[in-house]
């Protein structure tokens, strides 16, 4: 799993997927960075009192991460906001390990580089396995394909 041979000042875990959390935890525990940063991700329509970052902080502490090594950004709604919030929170860190889905990495990496970070990409949550063979079933309507379309549109508009 830990195929990354580089080290960063911080490991930043984007929100929205448990693979990101577990990937970030594994990198931190392997000594790849000195800080673990979670997002204060919270959508305006979400009435929960806690952000995902606050919940993940609790899980990280219960898994042996010292609380002083964990940072949480202010509330953010999208990846562009995340990059700015991370820069404000850990401005002294120049090199980060960005943990996000393989599908989302290209855009996320560009946004963090725009904020001045040197980004080491750590991709999780791959959507394909091995060789992808197209069959007639790929051309039929399905709820799964609708979900893939939604993911693509969200990536294009930056949500």
Question: Which role fits each region the language model picked out?
Answer:
Residues 148-159:
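A transmembrane-helix-recognition feature enriched in membrane-embedded lipid enzymes
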Residues 1-143, 149:
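A structural signal for short, hydrophobic/glycine-enriched beta-strand patches
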């Amino acid at each position: 799993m830990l195929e990354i041979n580089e080290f960063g000042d911080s490991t930043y875990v984007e929100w929205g997927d448990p693979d990101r959390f577990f990937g970030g935890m594994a990198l931190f525990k392997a000594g790849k960075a000195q800080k673990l940063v979670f997002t204060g991700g919270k959508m305006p329509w979400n009435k929960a009192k806690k952000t995902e970052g606050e919940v993940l902080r609790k899980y990280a502490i219960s898994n042996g991460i010292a609380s002083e090594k964990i940072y949480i950004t202010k509330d953010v709604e999208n990846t562009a906001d995340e990059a700015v919030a991370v820069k404000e929170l850990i401005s002294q860190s120049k090199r980060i390990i960005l943990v996000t889905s393989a599908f989302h990495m290209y855009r996320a990496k560009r946004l963090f580089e725009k904020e001045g970070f040197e980004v080491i990409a750590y991709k999780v949550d791959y959507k394909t396995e091995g060789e992808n063979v197209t069959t007639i079933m790929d051309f039929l309507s399905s709820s799964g394909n609708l979900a893939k379309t939604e993911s693509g549109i969200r990536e294009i508009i930056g949500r």
